[in-house]
């Protein structure tokens, strides 16, 4: 099965979406935890991502493949939540 993924140059964008953040972070229960961000971004990954994979579609759908021991701050502000 071909995934049709390629590495993206995520460093070319300085807009809000390039800031490291993650809305869908999943971590293992191990110590230290192994965390992955499952967010999909258009055309690039956030600025702190070392391994970015994007589909060949236009616009590209990109996901950071890095493993960290923490989750980045959420991308969406808490003001957007309906409490």
Curated annotation (Swiss-Prot):
Site (Reactive bond for elastase): 29-30
Organism superkingdom: Eukaryota
Record field: transmembrane: none
CDD domains for this protein: BBI
Covalent S-S links between cysteines: 21-75, 22-37, 25-71, 27-35, 45-52, 49-64, 54-62
GO molecular function: serine-type endopeptidase inhibitor activity
Listed Pfam families: Bowman-Birk_leg
InterPro entries: Bowman-Birk_prot_inh (IPR035995), Prot_inh_BBI (IPR000877)
SMART domains attached to this UniProt entry: BowB
Reactive bond for trypsin and chymotrypsin, annotated site positions: 56-57
Keywords assigned: Disulfide bond, Protease inhibitor, Serine protease inhibitor
Coiled-coil regions listed in the entry: none
GO CC terms: extracellular region
PROSITE patterns attached to this UniProt entry: BOWMAN_BIRK
Propeptide: 1-7
Family: Belongs to the Bowman-Birk serine protease inhibitor family.
Protein name, UniProt field: Bowman-Birk type proteinase inhibitor C-II
Organism: Glycine max
